[in-house]
Amino acid sequence: MIKEKLRYTKTGKRIESYEFDAKLHQKVVMDKFQFENHILVKHPEITLEIIKKVLEDPDIVTKQSKSKKEHFYQKKINNLNYFVVISQNPSIRKLRFVVTAFMAKDTNFLKEKNKYIRYKTK
């Protein structure tokens, strides 16, 4: 289930968001604005359900380096590779944010960048 939440910044700004559970992280949040104005516009094939599936049951989770905060969740659905990139906000511990989500026919473009495998299905 995808939860709709209201978050408030330190200055009191109200932010509508979606909340997901993820395989390696307790809580992952995506602003509705981010989804509607970035992901849907640039990657119209991505739905909230796809993001949920990729985060909850990924085939593989990688990182570019041990120090980088971004995690690349990957899952193959109907012969298409879906990616959800999440990152940590340094001021909010234990909370990750969706940076982007996209589909790619080939996963080789990530092999050079993402050398550190954090999770892989058996």
Indicate residue ranges for each PLM-predicted region.
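Ribonuclease/tRNase effector modules and their secretory precursors
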Residues: 1-122
